[in-house]
Amino acid sequence: MLMWLCKAPPNVQFQFPLPFSARTLIKHLPSWKPNPFSRHRTNSKALTTTTRIVNSSHFETLDSRQQEQIRLYVDALLQWNQKMNLTAVKEVNEVMERHIEDSLTILAPIHKSYTSHCNTSCDKIRLVDVGTGAGLPGLVLAIARPEWNVTLLESMNKRCVFLEHAVSLTGLSNVKVVRGRAENLGHNLGFREQFDVAVARAVAEMRILAEYCLPLVRVGGLFVAAKGHDPQEEVRNAERAVQLMGASLLQLCSVESQSPYGKRTAIVCLKDHPTPKKYPRDPGTPAKMPL
């Protein structure tokens, strides 16, 4: 997962209690830079993630309405979490650090890769968050990019109930909550190869995610997986699965941080060809028998 501390500028009243100093905040700011790969061929030996860019918190870039929507979402998340297992995090500042900033960090790889390799702007992106859980990162991305159409895909009914509540509470009109499994919806013509971008965070290993997500992505679209600081072995193991789904590994986008959580990586895949009709396999098979 991508996890970062948030920083509020001096002239902004932060909505959440922050138990640390401004000097500590500045010290923990993240940085990001893409590491490009060949579009059609992956070189395993070249899978490096040494990068440094981006120097500020993402929360502070949101306007006042978006910040209020985030506040409402976080409040609801912690309230509902007392009744159901939505997150292991119990405190507001931890939610901001481990979930909100983490989710917003995915925006940079999406923007950079989409504009560079998909031959179009990032306006009106159709994005699906596979295995969204509590709405991370999809609901947060929908707040940050109201011009995007975001689908939150979740198999558990109780989580879908929470997601519907959160969407209503925050007043989002660009979000659709869908209850279902990726293995089934990957064969549904209303979902198969209908999305510009698929994202997944803290769901499964890359071999499994490729089969879950890439059948939902249109040819020429992207799949972005949020992973840990050193995903190279996982990426190498997933090369065959990615290729079988009609895609290629495009780049690793690494975020460098001095926070206790260290460096995190977004793995970006480009959909080159249609996914063969036999994929995804039956529900449960990708997890039990990864490609």
State each model region's role.
Residues 104-203, 210:
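Conserved SAM/SAH cofactor-binding pocket of Class I
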Residues 90, 179-181, 251-253:
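Short loop/edge segments at beta-strand edges and connector loops
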Residues 159-161, 231, 235:
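Short alpha-helix immediately C-terminal to the canonical SAM-binding loop
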Residues 207-223:
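A short glycine-rich, Lys/Arg-flanked "PGG" loop and its adjoining helix->strand segment in the class I
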